[in-house]
Each structure stands twice: as C-alpha cells, then as structure tokens.
C-alpha cells in the first residue's frame, strides 16, 4: 500500500510513495497508479531486468538441455533483421554442436565430428552481431579475434594461441567453461594467399596464419600463457583442449562475387544460355551460389576450408531492411537515442521519411548497418550539444529535411505548446 505523508505542510500533505521502494513522487520521474498501489519507473525498470534475465535462463530446451533450433532463431529474430537462411543454418549448426557435447560423455560407436562455421557476406550485414548474439543465447564464453593482427609463431604480431587466451579470460580462467566456448575470427578474407601459386618466400600473415589456425580449429591441446606473449618465460602454461570450441569465421570477401559469376559463365555457354550482366544481380544474390572451390580461388587453402564445413552466406541489406534495423530490434538505434533523450526528459521522434533518407545514405556509403550510427550521430550532434542547457523542451522531431541538412530539428516546448523552433540550415 502506498503511503501518504502525515505532515501538515501544504505541498507534502498528499505526497504519494512507491509501494515497492518507498520513494516519493518527487524523487522519481514517473509514479504509476494502480487500484490500491503505486509503482515508480525505477522499480518497473528493475522488474523488466529481472524478467529479461529469467527469460534468458528459462529458454525452451531439448531433452539434452540444449536450446532447440526454433528457440535459437526466435531469439536471433529479436536482435537481427533479415538473413533468415543464415540464421536457420547457424541455429541448426550451434544446436548440433552443443548436442554433440552433451552426448560426448556417453559411450557410442559413432563419433560426431565438429562443424565449424564460415560466414560470408558484405560489410555491415550482421556477421559479427550474429556470432555475439549466438554466444549470449547459449550462455557460453565468447571472444572475437581479428585475423589481420595474427602472424605465424616466431614473427612479430599475435600468435593464434592468443585467441585461446582471450577466450580463457572471457571464461574468468575457468578452463572447463572455456573449452565449450565460441570463438569468432573476423576478417578471414584478409589472410588469403597472396598468390595462386605457392611462393618460395614465407607469407607469415596470409597462408602462414591459415596453417597456424588449422590445428586449433580441428582440435589440439594448446599451451596458453596466462599473462600472454613471450615476455614471461618462467610462467606456467595452462593446457586448453580446443576440440569442443566452436569456431566461426567471417569475412566480406570483396570480389568473391566476381569469382562466382565467372564460374557460372563457364557453365552457361551456347544459344540457349541465359546471360545476365553482373550489375543486374546484388552481391548477396550471387553469394548464394558459393561453393568451397570459389574460396580456394579467392586464396584460402583447401585444408582451411575443410575445417569449416558449414557455409552461410548473408544478404546485402536493402533500404527496407536498414529501416527495420533502425527501429525494430530490441536494441535498435532509434530506441537507444530515444533512451538518451529520455534522460533529459525529452521525447525524440523520427518521421518515416527521415528513416528512409538515413537508410539511403547508408546504402550510398556501402557500409551496411555499420554506417547507420555515424549518420545518426551527425544528425543529432548539435541537438545533443544544446539540449542539456535548453529549458522547457519536451519533444524533438527529426524530418527528412533535417537528415538532408536543409533544416534544423523541430523543438516543441512544454510551456508554450504552440511554439516550435525549426530554423533553416
């Protein structure tokens, strides 16, 4: 039951209090009234956090205690827009991987092999985000490595063992947990062989890294220095078995679509052949026809591709998909900026045509969803600079003219509801 102050002061006579935390209506931003109780915005937020955590742990699981593919894809849909085929491939691969681990202890005459995953798609289409979301769903340690920083052992740069060290750190040095984790190696297209022919000189950051990754991806006992690097020769090494670590590799593979198209042209020669200009097809559409031989042609060695049996290609994002990414996911960019403005007690509103204009600009930049934040920052920079010192603003409205740079955002004031500020840029 909410409390009412018994003070004789006129202002505090009918002060309402939150029934849960006891704070008064003056100490919180909002106080929501029920038939006999009151709850403040802070308690509502706390309740939502508790429910979110419980939902995460009470995920529907198969008999093996592993989330089902349908459950995995359902959660992925909440965070990642589009890419249905890639999400389906990933959810099945991850489900099978952890089901394999659940059965590993049981004696069986059939040994289940590990299926690492290769994600191929244009920049900004959600490869990294998919891998991060998967690790959150399964609740296992996750680490991300940049393939461009890796070199062969003995050369200046990061050893491949450093990847396992990062995973160990993500697992708080719990070796058992780390051995069930997920490793995402980004930019694998940058470690492609520099030439189609084997060279007499060593390619320490290209083919050399691919060779170094082979063993840890397939399964080996890696000796990991807890303090990293070679600067502490006296330290004791931790032994980490990589057999059950799921490796997901991703890359944009710029130019791979041309290799696929060239292979297709060879098989469609003659009077009855359908000839389509490469410009007529989107990159994602061409990538659907990807075969392992195309990756070999690109510069990955056959042994490396052999360790990545699951191939998932991602579509390049069109205008409608980018608009959805801006507004629909749980942590959509628009929702993030609206939350920032709420902290100033200001409502942030975007017109539909403004979202479309932002999406168009991201497509022109060719950076996919990654470019959306920088466009948003540019649009809202002046507003975020001015807002903390402005009095009485209750709403900021963004139109397509604001995105184009021909007008300033519309400020709506609470004390003078008719007064609006919209000065041409």
Swiss-Prot record:
ATP-dependent specificity component of the Clp protease. It directs the protease to specific substrates. Can perform chaperone functions in the absence of ClpP. Keywords: ATP-binding, Chaperone, Metal-binding, Nucleotide-binding, Zinc. GO terms for molecular function: ATP binding; ATP hydrolysis activity; ATP-dependent protein folding chaperone; protein dimerization activity; unfolded protein binding; zinc ion binding. It holds the Pfam family AAA_2. GO terms for biological process: cell division; proteolysis involved in protein catabolic process. Component of the ClpX-ClpP complex. Forms a hexameric ring that, in the presence of ATP, binds to fourteen ClpP subunits assembled into a disk-like structure with a central cavity, resembling the structure of eukaryotic proteasomes. This is ATP-dependent Clp protease ATP-binding subunit ClpX. It comes from Sinorhizobium fredii (strain NBRC 101917 / NGR234). Belongs to the ClpX chaperone family. Signal peptide: none annotated. It comes from the Bacteria. Coiled coil: none annotated. Zn(2+) binds at residues 18, 21, 40, 43. GO terms for cellular component: HslUV protease complex. Residues 6-59 form the ClpX-type ZB domain. SMART domains: AAA, ClpB_D2-small, zf-C4_ClpX. ATP binds at residues 122-129.
């Amino acid at each position: 039951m909410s409390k009412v102050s018994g003070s004789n002061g006129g202002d505090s006579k009918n002060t309402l209090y939150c029934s849960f935390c006891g704070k008064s209506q003056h100490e919180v931003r909002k106080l929501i009234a029920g038939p006999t109780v009151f709850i403040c915005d802070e308690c509502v937020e706390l309740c939502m956090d508790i429910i979110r955590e419980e939902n995460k742990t009470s995920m529907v699981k198969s008999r093996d205690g592993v989330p089902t593919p349908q459950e995995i894809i359902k959660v992925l849909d909440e965070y990642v827009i589009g890419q249905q085929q890639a999400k389906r491939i990933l959810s099945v691969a991850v489900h099978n991987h952890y089901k394999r681990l659940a059965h590993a202890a049981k004696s069986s005459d059939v040994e289940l092999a590990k299926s690492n995953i290769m994600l191929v798609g244009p920049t900004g289409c959600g490869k990294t985000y998919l891998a991060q979301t998967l690790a959150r769903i399964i609740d296992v340690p996750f680490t991300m490595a940049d393939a461009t920083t890796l070199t062969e052992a003995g050369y200046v740069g990061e050893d491949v063992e450093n990847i396992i060290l990062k995973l160990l750190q993500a697992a708080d040095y719990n070796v058992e947990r780390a051995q069930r984790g997920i490793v995402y190696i980004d930019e694998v297209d940058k470690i492609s062989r520099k030439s189609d022919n084997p060279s007499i000189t060593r390619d320490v950051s290209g083919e050399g890294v691919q060779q170094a990754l082979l063993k840890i991806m397939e399964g080996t006992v890696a000796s990991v220095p807890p303090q990293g690097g070679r600067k502490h020769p006296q330290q004791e090494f931790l032994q980490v078995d990589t057999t059950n670590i799921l490796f997901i590799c991703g890359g944009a593979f710029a130019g791979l679509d041309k290799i696929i198209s060239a292979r297709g042209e060879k098989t469609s020669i003659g009077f009855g052949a359908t000839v389509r200009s490469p410009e007529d097809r989107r990159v994602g559409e061409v990538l659907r026809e990807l075969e392992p031989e195309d990756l070999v042609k690109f510069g990955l060695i056959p042994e490396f591709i052999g360790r990545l049996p699951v191939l998932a290609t991602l579509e390049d994002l069109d205008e409608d998909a980018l608009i959805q990414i801006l507004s629909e996911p749980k942590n959509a960019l628009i929702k993030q900026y609206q939350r920032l403005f709420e902290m100033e007690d200001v409502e942030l509103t975007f017109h539909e045509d403004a979202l479309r204009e932002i999406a168009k600009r991201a497509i022109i930049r060719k950076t996919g969803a990654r470019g959306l934040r920088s466009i948003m920052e540019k649009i809202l920079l002046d507003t975020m600079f001015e807002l903390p010192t402005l009095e009485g603003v209750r709403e900021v409205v963004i139109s397509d003219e604001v995105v184009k740079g021909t007008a300033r955002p519309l400020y709506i004031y609470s004390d003078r509801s008719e007064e609006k500020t919209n000065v041409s840029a």
